From Swiss-Prot:
Residues the record marks as site: Important to generate the dianion: R107
Protein name: Acireductone dioxygenase
InterPro entries: ARD, ARD_bac, RmlC-like_jellyroll, RmlC_Cupin_sf
Cofactors demanded by this protein: Fe(2+); Ni(2+)
Pathway assigned to this chain's UniProt record: Amino-acid biosynthesis; L-methionine biosynthesis via salvage pathway; L-methionine from S-methyl-5-thio-alpha-D-ribose 1-phosphate: step 5/6
Marked site positions, May play a role in transmitting local conformational changes: D104
Gene: mtnD
Binding residues annotated for Fe(2+), in chain numbering: H99, H101, E105, H144
Residue stretches in coiled coil: none
């Protein structure tokens, strides 16, 4: 279950109902998908082949189709980041630059952990700490950035409004 940390006051929201309510009030789509469907050989696997990535997409194809039909998404892929990723530190520096997109940014966490820091409606930032099974959609035009948690590894399904993906605006 995702958890929230509000930057300015460093308070946390950890209760499932309260997390869902907070995100809904901020216009952030949050869903919990059944991660137990993932085959054991793909669980916590950060060295994915193209075949592994295709298998992950197939496992969650119904959920991807459902959210895509509801929200107009047209493309998806799988990304894997870990200490074995070439230039991981450079990538993280780039990901941690505050930006926005003209469409929403959707991630489903398959393995590992990630953090989206999002500017709230009141202008203050909050972290959404994500774990396997969490799907989040950062609203279009919301200032945000992404980073990894201390384990420095994540496998995520990215879902896009257009087949070209998204373009960050810094």
């Amino acid at each position: 279950m995702a958890q929230i940390r509000i930057h300015e006051v460093n308070t946390r929201i950890e209760n499932e109902v309260e997390v869902s309510k907070f995100l809904q009030e901020e216009g952030v789509l949050y869903e919990k998908w059944n991660i137990s469907k993932l085959p054991p050989h793909l669980n916590e696997n950060y060295s994915l082949t193209d075949e592994n990535k295709a298998e992950i997409l197939a496992v969650f194809s119904k959920e991807i189709a459902d959210v895509s039909a509801r929200r107009g998404y047209k493309a998806h892929d799988v990304i894997s980041l870990s200490n074995s990723t070439p230039n991981l530190d450079e990538l993280l520096i780039n990901f941690q630059k505050e930006h926005h997109h003209t469409d929403d940014e959707v991630r489903f966490i398959v393995s590992g952990h990630g953090i989206f820091a999002i500017e709230g409606k009141d202008g203050t930032f909050f972290d959404v700490e994500l774990e396997p099974g969490d799907l989040i959609s950062v609203p279009e035009n919301a200032r945000h950035y992404f980073t990894l948690q201390d384990d420095r590894q994540v496998v995520a399904i990215r879902i896009f409004v257009t087949t070209e993906g998204w373009v960050p605006i810094y």
